[in-house]
């Protein structure tokens, strides 16, 4: 009985494995930034928790659909797996979503190139904007989001 209760309680918490998907445009190289509902001062790229039956890539595809209604197929070349993941400290005001004593999350990085800027259908965010990579880095409170943009988009040349 005790293990059943523990399993049930663990299902109520978020997994501490997630994805970050930085969406940028092919024509302008601008980055899509999203304003969080639970912290309106927090702007970020698409993020999401990896479910128990998912790979990081499947999570990235699902989160693109859920957060901005961008439909990317499994074989699409628009979604690029950076094959990089980082561990970061979860902001204290978001820790209630995780099991007790969980303070860090492992995040897998992806890029998603779209042909041109689009108006996302928002279901989990208050607002959006398309900005330069430099401005996106300045806007986000997430150090890892800023690092991914700097590493992969600052020197992007066409």
Curated annotation (Swiss-Prot):
One of its GO terms (molecular function) is dATP diphosphatase activity. GO terms for biological process: folic acid biosynthetic process. Residues 14-153 form the Nudix hydrolase domain. Binds 1 Mg(2+) ion per subunit. SUPFAM superfamilies: Nudix (SSF55811). A motif (Nudix box) lies at residues 48-69. Mg(2+) binds at residues 63, 67, 124. Its cofactor is Mg(2+). It catalyses: 7,8-dihydroneopterin 3'-triphosphate + H2O = 7,8-dihydroneopterin 3'-phosphate + diphosphate + H(+). Substrate binds at residues 14, 36, 47, 88-91, 142. Its EC number is 3.6.1.67. InterPro entries: DHNTPase (IPR003564), NUDIX_hydrolase-like_dom_sf (IPR015797), NUDIX_hydrolase_CS (IPR020084), NUDIX_hydrolase_dom (IPR000086). It is an enzyme of class 3 (hydrolase). Keywords: Folate biosynthesis, Hydrolase, Magnesium, Metal-binding. Catalyzes the hydrolysis of dihydroneopterin triphosphate to dihydroneopterin monophosphate and pyrophosphate. Required for efficient folate biosynthesis. Can also hydrolyze nucleoside triphosphates with a preference for dATP. Belongs to the Nudix hydrolase family. This is Dihydroneopterin triphosphate diphosphatase.
